[in-house]
């Protein structure tokens, strides 16, 4: 996953470096409308924190990059994580944010269900209290007559909360399946893999809530190896070419590969 891809031109940049997935920040205005693809300060070391687009413009650019037949089409780009910056919202605005997010995606990315972008979407929410965003989103797609698009949507709570607490939030949101569990910290700091291992154990137990586990932000070869050894399904990185190099090492090249569009992002990989 290419990290912090907030300008349209960066889509090609990160995919050309080897990413098959990107992460994009989404900020909201005071009325819970998704407004900009903007992170702001602070962000990862060695990166510009200030690149941005109007959210709807970014969606149109993303649609071009993920629609077969379009001149801008990038066949390798199969999944997009929207890092929803809901910290600016009151808890009681979460549902409204989900409704507006759904309408924006439906119009500007999915083209109202008419040959829109094909990438899978993960809605990544930083606060467990904002679980109503999910129901606002799913209910709106159903009300707009496009429940089939929910097959393209997954969910993530990104606040590094206890695994049991995350499970409770999903239960409240009515979610069972399509769950990616993130764990991580900015590349400026160190973080162990104990919670990643807990998430992997939940995924592999056959009775947990997690379908996939990803770790962020992974920029070094040693950290990449540690994450792969821990059994993650994906890593978020500022340097996709570094990840590609490690995956081609003798220890990994016959064990892991980049996912393609034919691989379901919602089905747990059985070893």
From Swiss-Prot:
It comes from the Eukaryota. Mg(2+) binds at residues 23, 25, 83. It is an enzyme of class 4 (lyase). Disulfide bonds join 43-49, 45-188. Keywords: Cytolysis, Dermonecrotic toxin, Disulfide bond, Hemolysis, Lipid degradation, Lipid metabolism, Lyase, Magnesium, Metal-binding, Secreted, Toxin. It catalyses: an N-(acyl)-sphingosylphosphocholine = an N-(acyl)-sphingosyl-1,3-cyclic phosphate + choline; an N-(acyl)-sphingosylphosphoethanolamine = an N-(acyl)-sphingosyl-1,3-cyclic phosphate + ethanolamine; a 1-acyl-sn-glycero-3-phosphocholine = a 1-acyl-sn-glycero-2,3-cyclic phosphate + choline; a 1-acyl-sn-glycero-3-phosphoethanolamine = a 1-acyl-sn-glycero-2,3-cyclic phosphate + ethanolamine. Gene3D superfamilies: Phosphatidylinositol (PI) phosphodiesterase (3.20.20.190). GO terms for cellular component: extracellular region. GO terms for biological process: killing of cells of another organism; lipid catabolic process. Expressed by the venom gland. The active site is at residue 3. Belongs to the arthropod phospholipase D family. Class II subfamily. Dermonecrotic toxins cleave the phosphodiester linkage between the phosphate and headgroup of certain phospholipids (sphingolipid and lysolipid substrates), forming an alcohol (often choline) and a cyclic phosphate. This toxin acts on sphingomyelin (SM). It may also act on ceramide phosphoethanolamine (CPE), lysophosphatidylcholine (LPC) and lysophosphatidylethanolamine (LPE), but not on lysophosphatidylserine (LPS), and lysophosphatidylglycerol (LPG). It acts by transphosphatidylation, releasing exclusively cyclic phosphate products as second products. One of its GO terms (molecular function) is metal ion binding. This is Dermonecrotic toxin LhSicTox-alphaIA2bv. It is found in: Secreted. It comes from Loxosceles hirsuta (Recluse spider). The keyword Secreted applies. InterPro entries: PLC-like_Pdiesterase_TIM-brl (IPR017946). CDD domains: GDPD_like_SMaseD_PLD. SUPFAM superfamilies: PLC-like phosphodiesterases. Its EC number is 4.6.1.-. Its cofactor is Mg(2+). Binds 1 Mg(2+) ion per subunit.
